[in-house]
């Protein structure tokens, strides 16, 4: 697992509320906008995270799938 993938999963796991793309991106100073966006899309395609659109934020918010939560708690 790449460091950006691991860091994104950690950010989503530790966030008080489901973080938006902007919140995830702002915490990853070493990654580009494109790297973060592509990694989030790949994680969602693989079923590791779930996103939903938040109209008030005009962005998607992300949370971990049950499968990942189970793996992270072991």
What do the predicted segments below correspond to?
Residues 17-27:
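Short acidic, hydrophobic short linear motifs in intrinsically disordered regions
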Residues 30-45:
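Short amphipathic alpha-helical interaction segments
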């Amino acid at each position: 697992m790449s460091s950006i993938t691991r860091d994104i999963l950690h950010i989503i796991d530790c966030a008080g509320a489901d973080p938006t793309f902007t919140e995830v991106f702002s915490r990853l100073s070493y990654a580009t906008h494109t790297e973060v966006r592509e990694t989030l899309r790949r994680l969602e395609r693989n079923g590791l995270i779930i996103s939903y659109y938040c109209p008030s934020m005009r962005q998607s918010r992300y949370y971990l799938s049950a499968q990942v939560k189970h793996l992270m708690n072991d």
